[in-house]
């Protein structure tokens, strides 16, 4: 270096045996100057940082009083650990600010750059890729959550209750195949139906006489305290017999009714009324022989087929699906017994009559149309499919206490049947 000669190679002189007999060589500087002080060694190192040193400046009154901004004078001080950390932190902040400053590039230059660079040659920074991946994942999660919430809402709205879960430990409920049993009933209920105009083939009786007979049989059934199944089977046997045997005299119509009740009692009841009781209830209009002969004729005509689904079979299942209480149950049976007397209601199947009776009773008690998904599932009928039949039931409810055929109204106007006949009809269903 120009300012120091201490790094230049010296010359080793020859051995001078005369001067003290030195065995080693002596380093002779070329310029004869001695080595500089050690304190200035930093100047001789290439690229070495300059050590700061404190420079004291005198304090002037002018500088202390004046409000003018005086450019700061660089202070040279020894580098301690704390001071070095501050310097490193300042350099880091400056570096961050420089990286944040966008490069000003003209549009033409930018276009050229974008045109020249291919998509596959440019890699996005890792933090950008991670951010995009996180956003995509969040979007997916939000989509899944929205879909799950929609599915949950749909499940809540369209959920069908397991109405047989409470009877799993009851072997008499046959929970394992109860649904198969009712599917079989639905398929075979058409066999228990009769043509809705079969009275046109009768020569001596009509639908009004049929209604009188059924209204009387409902009172007889109530006085004998028979099972509900017996009443519905009695009505079914009479209609099926009259639909096939087309030459029944008017004076024999009551005999057909009494005999049908006897057959139904033998099929359903544990304790069957004796023939003499039936003769007495018919005011001794028929003899024992006539009743037994009609019994044989009816059994042969119907081919001993008494096991067919009636509206009562479906009523029990549909009431369970509707989670009915006693009030709803009594009003539903009141509705459907009104239909038994009416000839025009033969156009509906037993299952449709049962579902319509429950739907009408629910709407009557609640004051609005009500038909749950569970009831729809187990009955197989939507609310729209029941409206026509339900409106006719409301009409029958309106006139139940009027006219000559009031047996059903008197029966359900007692405390035993919860005074169901006194409930106001659901007139809003007629609108």
Swiss-Prot record:
GO terms for biological process: cell division; mitotic cell cycle phase transition. GO terms for molecular function: cyclin-dependent protein serine/threonine kinase regulator activity. The keyword Cell cycle applies. InterPro entries: Cyclin, Cyclin-like_dom, Cyclin-like_sf, Cyclin_A/B-like, Cyclin_C-dom, Cyclin_N, Cyclins_cyclin-box. Residues 1-30 are annotated as: Disordered. Keywords: Cell cycle, Cell division, Cyclin. Pfam families: Cyclin_C (PF02984), Cyclin_N (PF00134). Belongs to the cyclin family. Cyclin AB subfamily. Interacts with SMR11. This is Cyclin-B2-4. It comes from Arabidopsis thaliana. The gene is CYCB2-4.
């Amino acid at each position: 270096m120009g300012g120091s000669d201490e790094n230049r190679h010296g010359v080793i002189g020859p051995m001078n045996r005369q001067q003290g007999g030195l065995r080693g060589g002596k380093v002779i500087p070329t310029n004869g100057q001695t080595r500089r002080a050690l304190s200035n060694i930093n100047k001789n190192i290439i690229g070495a940082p300059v050590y700061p040193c404190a420079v004291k400046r005198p304090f002037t009154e002018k500088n202390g009083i004046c409000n003018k901004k005086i450019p700061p004078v660089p202070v040279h001080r020894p580098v301690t650990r704390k001071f070095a950390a501050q310097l490193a932190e300042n350099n880091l902040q400056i570096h961050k600010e420089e990286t944040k400053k966008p490069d000003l590039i003209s549009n033409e230059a930018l276009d050229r750059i974008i045109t020249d660079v291919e998509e596959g040659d440019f890699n996005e920074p890792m933090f950008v890729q991670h951010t995009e991946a996180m956003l995509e994942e969040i979007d997916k999660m939000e989509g899944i959550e929205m879909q799950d919430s929609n599915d949950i809402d749909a499940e809540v709205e369209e959920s069908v209750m397991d109405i047989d879960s409470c009877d799993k430990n009851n072997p008499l409920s046959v929970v394992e195949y109860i649904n198969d049993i009712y599917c079989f009933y639905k398929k075979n209920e058409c066999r228990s139906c009769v043509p809705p105009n079969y009275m046109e083939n009768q020569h001596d009786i009509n639908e009004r006489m049929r209604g009188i007979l059924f209204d009387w049989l409902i009172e007889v059934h109530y006085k004998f305290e028979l099972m509900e199944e017996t009443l519905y089977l009695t009505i079914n046997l009479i209609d099926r017999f009259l639909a096939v045997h087309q030459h029944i005299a008017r004076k024999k119509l009551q005999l057909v009714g009494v005999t049908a009740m006897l057959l139904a009692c033998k099929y359903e009841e544990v304790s069957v009324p004796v023939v003499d009781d039936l003769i007495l209830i018919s005011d001794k209009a028929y003899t024992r022989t006539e009743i037994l002969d009609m019994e044989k004729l009816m059994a042969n005509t119907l081919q001993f087929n008494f096991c067919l689904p009636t509206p009562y079979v479906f009523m029990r299942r549909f009431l369970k699906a509707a989670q009915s209480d006693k009030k709803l149950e009594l009003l539903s049976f009141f509705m459907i017994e009104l239909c038994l007397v009416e000839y025009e209601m033969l156009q509906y199947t037993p299952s449709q009559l049962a579902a319509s009776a429950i739907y009408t009773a629910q709407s009557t008690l609640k004051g609005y149309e009500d038909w749950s998904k569970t009831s729809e599932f187990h009955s197989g009928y939507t609310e729209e499919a029941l409206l026509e039949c339900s409106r006719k039931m409301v009409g029958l409810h309106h006139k139940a206490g009027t006219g000559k055929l009031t047996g059903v109204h008197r029966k359900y106007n007692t405390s035993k049947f919860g005074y169901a006949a006194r409930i106001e009809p659901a007139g809003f269903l007629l609108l």
